[in-house]
Amino acid sequence: MTMAAKTDREALQAALPPLSGSLSIPGLSAPVRVQRDGWGIPHIKASGEADAYRALGFVHAQDRLFQMELTRRKALGRAAEWLGAEAAEADILVRRLGMEKVCRRDFEALGAEAKDMLRAYVAGVNAFLASGAPLPIEYGLLGAEPEPWEPWHSIAVMRRLGLLMGSVWFKLWRMLALPVVGAANALKLRYDDGGQDLLCIPPGVEAERLEADLAALRPAVDALLKAMGGDASDAAGGGSNNWAVAPGRTATGRPILAGDPHRVFEIPGMYAQHHLACDRFDMIGLTVPGVPGFPHFAHNGKVAYCVTHAFMDIHDLYLEQFAEDGRTARFGNEFEPVAWRRDRIAVRGGADREFDIVETRHGPVIAGDPLEGAALTLRSVQFAETDLSFDCLTRMPGASTVAQLYDATRGWGLIDHNLVAGDVAGSIGHLVRARVPSRPRENGWLPVPGWSGEHEWRGWIPHEAMPRVIDPPGGLIVTANNRVVADDHPDYLCTDCHPPYRAERIMERLVASPAFAVDDAAAIHADTLSPHVGLLRARLEALGIQGSLPAEELRQTLIAWDGRMDAGSQAASAYNAFRRALTRLVTARSGLEQAIAHPFAAVPPGVSPQGQVWWAVPTLLRNDDAGMLKGWSWDEALSEALSVATQNLTGRGWGEEHRPRFTHPLSAQFPAWAALLNPVSRPIGGDGDTVLANGLVPSAGPEATYGALSRYVFDVGNWDNSRWVVFHGASGHPASPHYADQNAPWSDCAMVPMLYSWDRIAAEAVTSQELVPA
């Protein structure tokens, strides 16, 4: 070890906060015990609710302060102050969205209980800042000091983590693809081949005029997509699995819930494992550092719940027509005044950036220039209306049944979920937890004319009308970002979602397990069977012998392949090389490679040509639809893809090719520290189509870029038999033994104990700390 490396390691060690002994915390009414188990997971026991949330804020700051502050900065358009020019465009976008204004608005509208929860939580965060404990190493690298927290900051953090997830990116993509391939072919680029209702939208002459206006905005949309970077990829490429099994189908005679949320791999991960108890509740689950409570995955000893993204259409894009001076926008036969102001962001290592913020009746301009006559505005559930999701967070801990839990979520709107639940009485259920505006179905296809008055919101779809079921016949519930309603559902809810492959495979395995056990959940988590192996084998067998020996050998390899994207499979690597070659070919022949002609084409599905075509190719091939091949047949395309793919075969197992790269947000800025900041990774299997959903960027390479941030299984009623895992560890400190200690079991699709009984926690605790009133 060099002296410099030793010094760096010593600095990392010095940044670790003390996790044992006694600490005085202002505002506590009674002592709070914090015990950490062998995986560094905190178990917090307080007397009262306010003390519990205060302690959670303190413990979050102990383990994840840098992450919390960076997320807050990203939410408020201040990340470039730390990350430099690479974060500037994203900062400008969230400033235009008005994040601070809407979060302050939401806080003022919350009930007293939610306000008290938020105040107690940030008081705990601020108590850590004032405690004199060492700061995370990142502050020393940046030469920065932490800033105090205010209650509305937690709302900003929560809103940032679901920022613009879902439909906005699909609408922008179709806007770019439509002039290239036409409406009929653009329909085929839907993720899930969900229906035919889009063929006639927008209709007739209006379509031609709208296409011309939208095409003129293409450079501005390109810039918007580039600004979002990995955030757009998360919004479009992420996903999740979850499922519930009723008592009549389990070996235990009790409900079992399991699943895994899929997002872009960020260090630290967006979730932290916590256990929080007081006189009102005893909850364990995944928390969001910077946010009090358990919004997505948890149980309280009576009811367990978990979520996947429901892909409800909660964002609308409007094409606006402005007067020459850009100060008014057309609506009907009138031009209305628009709000216009100037803002500025600071950029580390560079000059400040000034920019205009323009808002019409529909929302802020996010692409285009009003001074050039046209621009796109966004009206999103996440920003346009007051959100009371944090009121839901205070009600959810008190639920004892699935039905009570669903009633507690009334008004949730920050992001849309399939909320799957099970309770100790034996019920299981599914609810689409979302606020969805009532408006024309046409809004789901493209940006719509903002001047016509025909695409306005007309209130909300009632909570009671959202898709839900409790105790369904058959005793099985599965969601995996698949379509939850048909295109002809009475209320317009969604246009885009993920293909049904993962949901179908999970259901297939559950149906085959009449006595489902907790141990069976890990086997489903680890399922690597590609849904396309049968189609691929049939087409390649019919294709016949290839002219070149390497292409023929590849054809035979793929025909013989068992269809499993296993880490050790060389055939899985060959399949990926072939599918990427076929995707590039279809993208090129269709002309879609020109739809976004800049380096942002490397962003995952939803906004890049190859990303969209990647998902569409299996359906096109299954239907023998060669409409985008410009005169080629599929046999010609398959032969060419075989030939091209042979040039990219490495002979390595899929896991080595697919190994993710976990990158700390400061490692590029401080490369000498990268080896210490970046956690190690291991070979992993799966791809974006398999239940083991470790997805990739088709245009960039085979490396996994998103996957399961966590896996979990709830044994409802026998809570100590529940299990979980996260992809790196409980701590955000690179020197902590718990920074990446869960990566080994995660890579093997194993889980660690979810300790719930306090006597067992006491017996297995590795550290214990008492927080006492100051």
From Swiss-Prot:
GO terms for molecular function: penicillin amidase activity. It is an enzyme of class 3 (hydrolase). The active site is at residue 240. The keyword Mitochondrion does not apply. One of its GO terms (biological process) is antibiotic biosynthetic process. It catalyses: a penicillin + H2O = 6-aminopenicillanate + a carboxylate. Keywords: Antibiotic resistance, Hydrolase, Zymogen. It comes from the Bacteria. Belongs to the peptidase S45 family. This is Penicillin acylase 2 proenzyme. The lineage of its organism: Bacteria, Pseudomonadati, Pseudomonadota. The gene is acyII.
